[in-house]
């Protein structure tokens, strides 16, 4: 019988590839997505449409409103930067987002009897978010085994899998294509147009387009503008 794994699944390029990797490694995926008041809710609609296609046995969407907290261009009335990828932590960082997401995933994993959680964080072609680093993943894994009944009673050890963390975006794309991922059914933009098109200029779009260019593949997603940098 396959081992269950909870996959943090946004509907974007990285999390979709992560789901495909979990399947390749023999896990039964249980997808978890979040409706947290994000301005790029097109991505969530993509996740809802494609979770079953990607092989998820279940798809759980958790709703809460981080707009009440604010502090990010994704959850507050702040402009999403379009000038290019800068230094430092950008305004698109959502305070403690991955900690919140992983905590929900940990709770569901414990209920499911799953000890494996997959998250598509990346520390190479990324925007500089502090909760995408290897040391953060290691620290949360340690916390997971201290903060749960299963961890304390020793019935199992939780593992946080971050298979993309040391891969370039081009390597991620090549891996996904080798596993049959249809990237035309993913969405990564932070600030889509009213029609749902990727803007092509935010950090996420720039990193995605750069990855496809370096992989020698055309991105199948339509863009309002296709950034060259």
Swiss-Prot record:
Alphabetized UniProt keyword annotations: ATP-binding, Ligase, Metal-binding, Nucleotide-binding, Queuosine biosynthesis, Zinc
Organism: Geotalea daltonii (strain DSM 22248 / JCM 15807 / FRC-32)
Binding locations of Zn(2+): 189, 199, 202, 205
Enzyme class: ligase
UniProt GO molecular function: ATP binding; ligase activity, forming carbon-nitrogen bonds; zinc ion binding
Cofactor dependence: Zn(2+)
Its EC number(s): 6.3.4.20
Family, as annotated: Belongs to the QueC family.
Annotated cofactor note: Binds 1 zinc ion per subunit.
CDD domains the record matches: QueC-like (cd01995)
InterPro entries registered for this protein in UniProt: QueC (IPR018317), Rossmann-like_a/b/a_fold (IPR014729)
SUPFAM superfamilies in alphabetical order: Adenine nucleotide alpha hydrolases-like
Pathway: Purine metabolism; 7-cyano-7-deazaguanine biosynthesis
Role noted for this protein: Catalyzes the ATP-dependent conversion of 7-carboxy-7-deazaguanine (CDG) to 7-cyano-7-deazaguanine (preQ(0)).
Protein name: 7-cyano-7-deazaguanine synthase
Top-rank taxon, per record: Bacteria
Catalytic reactions on record: 7-carboxy-7-deazaguanine + NH4(+) + ATP = 7-cyano-7-deazaguanine + ADP + phosphate + H2O + H(+)
NCBIfam families: 7-cyano-7-deazaguanine synthase QueC
Gene: queC
Binding site for ATP: 9-19
Keyword ATP-binding included in the entry's annotation: yes
Gene Ontology biological-process entries: queuosine biosynthetic process
